[in-house]
Amino acid sequence: MIDLTEEQIERYSRHILLQDVGLEGQEKLLNAKVLIVGAGGLGSPVALYLAAAGVGHIGIVDADVVDLSNLQRQVIHQTKDLGTPKVESAKEKMLAINPDVEVTTYHDFLDSHNAEEIIKPWDFVIDGTDNFPVKFLINDACVRLGKAFSHGGILRFQGQTFTHLPGTACYRCFFKEPPPAGAVPTCSQAGVLGAIAGMLGTIQAAEALKYFLGVGDLLTDRLLTFDAKTMNFRTIKVKKRASCEICGDHPTIDHLIDYEQAACDLKHH
């Protein structure tokens, strides 16, 4: 266990005051290892809140550089960061918030060749991506490696999320396979309200913190959806499918798959 310094006790004092956290819980967070895939709309609030919370080891994967159109929702980046790799921009802000955090960057695309190698050292994975192929890749790699992860998806005014633990419903239990390329509009085509990314990203961050603290009920075996226009939140119960291609009784997928690109992630209704 880590012995907190006086400065750390002050920094995390509002956590430590919580009966469900305390010194022991904060020490758990300082030992935690979280990988964030995507340093964009969802990854931004997740990275900021996990760093502020004192999650001791955070990895972040993204091959892109900061673009002007990102700044409407990707709040970890600033105008001065234009053209900078997103992972480096994110690392700078995370360390500025909390120098206790160790940040590992992967300036690369996640694909079938590197996904398991990148994910393997981490305890919890945040899916902050904006395309179906990588979402299925993250799911399949995490299931194969026995890793917990939080799925998140946003489009227009809507968001959805769930959490997977080994033995609970996975992404393929909800959605069997990616839609055909081009069947779902991209965020650049359909748009997204910037604040939606913050709403969903902070939920994902809370799920990660709850996981390490062992507090409350995680969003397992249920999909949380919301519509910011109406502010209606609902949860849909989904059972693990015995016939699931990756986590079922007789899995048929025995390797990772690079699907054809089909960006954004909410089903088009």
Regions found by a protein language model. Give the residues of each.
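Adenine nucleotide-associated cytosolic modules
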Residues: M1-H269
